[in-house]
Amino acid sequence: PVLIQPNAGLPELIDGKPVFPLKPENFAESVERMADMGVKMVGGCCGTNPDFIKALRTRLGNRKYRKRDNPKRTAAASARQTVFFDRGFRVIGQRINPSGRKDLADSIRNGDLDPLYEEAVLQKQAGAEILDINVHTENSEERDIMAKAVEYIQSMIPIPLQLDSSDYSVLEAGARVYNGKPIINSVNGTRISMEHVFPVVRKYGGCVIGLSLDENGISPKAEGRLEVARKIVGTARTYGIPKEDILIDCLVQSAARGAKAARETLKAVSLIKRELGVKTVLGISNISYGRRERSVLNAVYLAMAMGAGLDCAIVDPTAKEIAEVVGVYNMLSSTE
């Protein structure tokens, strides 16, 4: 349900004091229009008093709640912006991650979050629509840092965030302070993971990335990953989490394992979308791990994944080749 507590209009500074322009009747009339949009609970904030609440009661007291018939869509949201996953390919920026980056890891351990903000700005300017936030470092309080990082970045960056940790308590710490609907990264098909992560997703609301692996590891076959994905979607439903709030990661493995493994992941993308009707995501840069020409390999594999029906990818949006692939794909697939 949506709750609103608006001010009595925008204040004007008169004789050094804020004066709110709306009278109780005007205020109630404005709030009534919001109720017509589907708001369930109403109240008043700055500039209101009991007369305003009485006017609300008089106008809305006998009104029945107008339930909205909302379409089921996959979306992530900040307090200021919503990203829908049925409107073109979506880019999730991966650069706020200290893995393999000593300078960033040192900053996080020292409580300096400015480099995270700088990375957030850089990625947004490069075209990222969602930012992955991973703050795991050795010998640090990851839960506290995640909460502080989420609050800090959200205070200045308008796009949604993806909370990334293998520790469910860290995910909860981030979700608790998040304004909007985040993406939780991630849950997998093991019983213990689902028992820990799904309650967090249900309690705070959000999308969740489901890794297509379980107690048996990563299946070498697309069909095996489909069954794990099916288990994740089915179990999520028992927690009240709809499939529209699930993105399945079909798990990219290094090309060093062979071209067959790379193709099997793409097959899994198509299969899972067709059979389960859920959105799919990949961490593209895993394909080039341990290889020389990483940028070209990442870009080519991203293009192949898009052709297989991939909905979004976790990538470095500042990489020129990645930006070009995404731009050309969205241009050619546009219905405008």
State each model region's role.
Residues 1-247, 253-336:
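Domain-level signal for soluble alpha/beta catalytic cores
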